[in-house]
């Protein structure tokens, strides 16, 4: 909030003011008409009298201000804007060609040209410029009265805070805010029109500008009373949603549209909306979501506040009923909380079980498990009390508390909220006032005054449940920019209550919310984007539908009785007296007054008196936004009860009153019936909780999904860029808007517009236009008419000292770039190449001047910055003033003493210490700097930056100084541009590779090499190519993209089957360690981070006495004195970036829908992704860039029908990242700074380094096994309908495959077995685990499969070599699943294997996993690839009868092909993807034969072979670059039917001759058309057969017997487990039985019946139904596989049956 005209009144200013009027440039306050009506009724204030003199006879009410502004007409073409068009075109050309996406040029060109020349758009643009010029002239001015000003045919008179607008004979008296609202509307429409032209040019339906113009005209022609007009405006968006659902819902009906009155009250608008619906539903949703372009209503304060106060008191249910329902909600809360707690921590929270508690709960608690039964029987939890789980954080960090919120200092100050003259007018009495305010009216000032020095003391009354009388007052403030005529109100409270609010909400957010799955309050924005995309997609597939709930005034419905039981439980969970319960009853003892300056309540003995409109004493609820999190929890509780009552499967996602429920379809009822039952139950339970669910306004849909202002249609986000761009304002809440902050705000708005869209282009092109318009308003004509100067100005961004500009915002494509400098240089390079701009003009605009001395502080705060002299920005000046102001403030408070230290100097000193680092690593410097107290101090000063409060608080800063400072900045920018001198010559840095140029430029300005900062510009490092005609060289290092089908323009707005790519989940850089026993506070967190980094440097062998000294000082200044350097879970540091952010999910700057049609992988970047070294590649950027390429090809009218690739083009951009050691050359001078927080930091126990002697590889493997085991157990419990993203419990995804390759996996597997044996699984868990592994689902199993893609690792599981003969597996996934299940298949063997782990390793803690892995990196060895054999042929061999693929149909074909290859002595063989993969796999195993697969750019076939192979044959024998490039063969080939060099087989009708090796030959082989004679080929001996070609089970009779016995006992075990489908396991077992019967010479039946079940607690598997309880299972299609013949010869004496269990023998022997 900023100052208003009220600064003039003596009574409110801290000192005499040289009057500054109208201190706003954009609308930040609600529109209120009370001052106007007071002015018309009375003439007591001098400026009101002056205003009344200007009024015409016909004077409109201020609420109808829009009627007058709609009539403004400007003479056409006042402003010359041709230069804007040319500049915009030039800028876009440069950007597009720098990104190598030149096909976009034409599309963008035409859209910009059309946008700025269309007469309607141009007229709106000129109107906007005219408004802005007036706003610039009248705001922040010294004259009280200005005028008359002309705005086309309107004349405006500004009188202090009032404005009189006149057209002809009609006038309208209004406040300055009304005028700003009109200016904002003009701006919004101008932006909307430009954005819609650009959007129209870029999407398949073509231009829709006419519809938008039509809509503006229709709305402007509505002539209805104020309230009806705004009812229409407000219902456009929901009515459109209703229309779309009415037309496009499939399985549920929706009559939501019938709630609204648009068809009757405005038929024109109705027909326009229906026309858009015909054209395209997405267009309708997109256009109707724009709500801010139709003026804002004036809030009707009297009705609005009366209604608000009534709602805060009305009783829907009796208090007794609410209290008992509150207890019901408490039971479900406990159940849900405990369930979440168990799944996160694998144990129960501390609980107390009351007498009479159910036995099943006791059992579950002892086992630390959660039973699915509890979901249905949640009432049992009435007897469970959750005990203390955490302490309240009583000393919260200032950063969390001090946002610039208004507070009211104490109850006595209420009279300062009102105008004395208005009180006199209303009550004819004088308003009694204290001589001065009792304290500050802003939180920031309270901080400076020392009110926040002792927060625990402030909160102490809440513990006792007795809040001071002085604190019990709340001011309800109307909210700005709302479309509700009756307004919404927010609460402004006293300091103590405000802090209470913050602490209570923070406790819930951090300690309770993470365990509840029904809300999105703790999710990051990217996680939410992923989640919403997934949800909206599931709805459209027809498996589920969504119910969108609409509660009427949700915030006002929560009564103390309903909250009391839950608050009591929370008080027990946080062990904090009456803390939460106090909050329930507080409103009953609080006085509420409405903030409306000119309508005060009556004052009796200095207390406000209740009148139901301006004041209420004691209500039932606190008002909006106060206990949001508590209420969200309660809401989801009653929704869960309601939905469980009618027995549907569902998910709830809600935040506040924005509740959506996804209901999954059921087998017995259709969706419509489900929806009606669900709504009925929800209505009933909402009523029980005292809430009113507006059932007719709740909608049900299976095509639309809306959550948190994001809208999805058929699973694809509706582009929100029109809505975002029409709301772009230049106000940032700055004290005083200056050029820099305006442009920065504009560029960041473009960023958020791109985030709301499925493509970045609209935001970028519109952003450039809006940017030029902003400059047009701000800069003088001399600059604006010089086209090349303007173009250059827009392409020079902040990284080389320019202004913020959308052109250097790659974040339209990615949300942030790791290094902006190479991109900046690439833009300038392109500018000089593509346009006629000379290098000297670039030098003149950039004016690069090296700073006289290195400013290390700026390098530490932004490691990518250059050391150059820049124009001093206003905020830096203001920051200096703020420091001075705080330092001179008379109060003695902790914060004042903190700021009496010369913070900036100390920061510079520390930065200088860090600059002695050799080599200089700015990212490490930055990480170290951030741990210090000065860094914390500077971050607190930034809090004051935005707050206007400091200005009013300090005697030193006048608002006028700030205004002058802003003008000075603009003037110096203009001077700099007009001045023709050139700075440092940039020429040498604008040639060649920008990666090298950026490194040199950094070296030039800093005078030293900076290591580890520069990252290459992705579009220079990689170039896109189509796979058609791509040569093998391009595939040497390439990222390959394969479209799912031919992509055309409609794919841009529909979803494919691939996952949505928003940037990978990059692993945590330094994992935040949990240091046990540290108190939770900002200081403790910093200490923790310091210790983590310390430990991390130890692991990296950075030993440096100076660094140790510095670290010790960091710890000391925070009050940490202990010598214990605690054990830390601390982590992996990739890419030299010790940033302490947790996982940064997602980096794309837009919703990348096209990625769902593309498969891509970096596996073919052979030199980089396969090596264990790190290179300078930012994979997220590269992947996104590839998707963007496809997007731009399609948008410019092309299609993508074949795979394409990004190939590494600039060799110098790839630099290997070397070792990471550094030392500090000098003794640090920094001595530490004072700390703000009083609590000392302690670490409880001494920690010994016993584990140092252990082998880190073994420790890491041992821990990994346990983590995988625990993750499996959590996966079992995860339900398939869970909406949260499927990640492993232990966050295993953070480990890269190259880390995993260095661990000995034989130990990992044994450790996993040890864990599974020790876990003593329950029946249902065992069943769940087996089901999950057999179905190959779950995130943990996917992780294992990803690791085991590398066959060398799989074969390295040492037990596997010995155990594989006992495992009957069909594929790699099957093998991994059975490997994990081995403890259940053969417990005996597993016991022996597990005992081989040295018992001393049982002491290692999986908490330190990351450190072990970091240490293992340097010592671990990657297992080598080895290639096993297949049976081979030669001209004179020795027959041994062992054939590959002996179980498959293509075995003979494969043998013949191998003979042909050997006969023709081939060295290279081409294979087409039409060949059976098993045959291709067999051929890959032939030594001395290079295989080229004819892939034509699509690696899918090759990946299939890799997956089938269990050794390194495929990866080593296939020449992959040539395979990808090959479209036809150039030699001998198999696959096609005819052609040169084709080897084909011809099946013989009858077997013509016996072959010396094969008993009978089924094929003749032909080369072209000649028969190849293979009659003399015979076998070569076979040493190490490949397990993929020869099943180990059939390798010898001995291994077959073991496998048969294992399999039998496993099946018998499974029969006893309830909940496992026995059939697939029985079929596997029967496969072995058939072979056994064949060996024994028994007849093999084609079909057999088994009887299965449990009789007398013993499992039964028999051929005869000897008990009625047995289940009958039929297995058909039985035939022995050819391998059996070989085993039959081996078993000459029937030794197979010796020692088999009797049951098994009975099954083997056929009666």
Curated annotation (Swiss-Prot):
Gene this protein is translated from: L
Pfam families recorded: Mononeg_mRNAcap, Mononeg_RNA_pol
Function: Displays RNA-directed RNA polymerase activity. The viral mRNA guanylyl transferase displays a different biochemical reaction than the cellular enzyme. The template is composed of the viral RNA tightly encapsidated by the nucleoprotein (N). Functions either as transcriptase or as replicase. The transcriptase synthesizes subsequently three subgenomic RNAs, assuring their capping and polyadenylation by a stuttering mechanism. In replicase mode, the polymerase replicates the whole viral genome without recognizing the transcriptional signals.
Matches recorded under InterPro entries: Mononeg_mRNAcap (IPR026890), Mononeg_RNA_pol_cat (IPR014023)
Protein's name in the database: RNA-directed RNA polymerase L
Domain of life: Viruses
Keyword Hydrolase: no
Entries under PROSITE patterns matching the protein: RDRP_SSRNA_NEG_NONSEG
Annotated EC: 2.7.7.48
Compartments where located: Virion; Host nucleus
Motif residue range(s): Nuclear localization signal: 844-852
Record's GO cellular component terms: host cell nucleus; virion component
Subunit composition and interactions: Interacts with the P protein.
Domain RdRp catalytic: 543-715
Alphabetic keyword roster: ATP-binding, Host nucleus, Methyltransferase, mRNA capping, mRNA processing, Multifunctional enzyme, Nucleotide-binding, Nucleotidyltransferase, RNA-directed RNA polymerase, S-adenosyl-L-methionine, Transferase, Viral RNA replication, Virion
Enzymatic class: transferase
Keyword Coiled coil on entry: no
Coiled-coil region list: none
Signal peptide range in chain numbering: none
Reactions mediated catalytically: RNA(n) + a ribonucleoside 5'-triphosphate = RNA(n+1) + diphosphate
MF terms (GO), sorted A to Z: ATP binding; mRNA 5'-cap (guanine-N7-)-methyltransferase activity; RNA-directed RNA polymerase activity
Organism, scientific name: Borna disease virus 1
